[in-house]
């Protein structure tokens, strides 16, 4: 693996916002050796032309790849192709409607260079949503823990809730931990990675990683209405199926309290 960082952006029909995303990458990727792979999952709304445009105008930064299979599949295929194409030591992900913050990649890669015992570096993030009046509101989401050495601590610290995009991973480990096509595929990916590759480090000194845009996402209101019970049930079932020897269980005490334990 060569020194550097690869950012993978899966793209499908995001013509309204993809320029904002790519401009944030162009302006904020920092000084660490860097490459951004845009994997287009057969867009039909003009997003493809924008991806090609940035590839041509900024060939030292962007690589545009289009999957042609006559119909959108899922982000899983696009992300996995980006992983397979990555040749740098570190890798990360950004959704096509989110934005990259200045300093995040340099900060994460430098930390992992200096602390090779950790497999992942994560930050808090900024969440941008539309309120009931249609106005854009921003809040930050951060976490109280730094070093995480075991899986239960990871869950209690909320490390699985930090957007998987707000993290820097080691590429050679990610290549052995591809995305699978199931519910909460991003959380499943991150939990599997953490389970296999502890310890990880959460830098709670800043939320400057990504801007998680949800003013474009019509499904977000539906997603936040799902109960914790149903989400945890589906996630744990998937982990048991995909991780041989997975030895953790959970039990709800009431609507707000869940007990996690090792079997």
Where would I find each of the regions flagged by the language model?
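Short, well-formed alpha-helical segments that are part of the catalytic scaffolds
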Residues: 14-27
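A conserved acidic beta->alpha catalytic loop
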Residues: 24, 40-50, 95
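Short beta-strand/loop segment that forms part of the nucleotide-sugar
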Residues: 33-42, 63-68, 96
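Glycine-rich, basic loop-to-helix element that forms the pyrophosphate-binding segment
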Residues: 68-86
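Short, flexible, basic/aromatic active-site loop/helix in glycosyltransferases
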Residues: 69, 124, 138-159
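Short aromatic/hydrophobic "clamp" motif used to bind/position activated sugar donors
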Residues: 91
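Conserved donor NDP-sugar-binding/catalytic core segment of glycosyltransferases
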Residues: 103-137
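Conserved nucleotide-sugar donor-binding catalytic segment
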Residues: 147-228
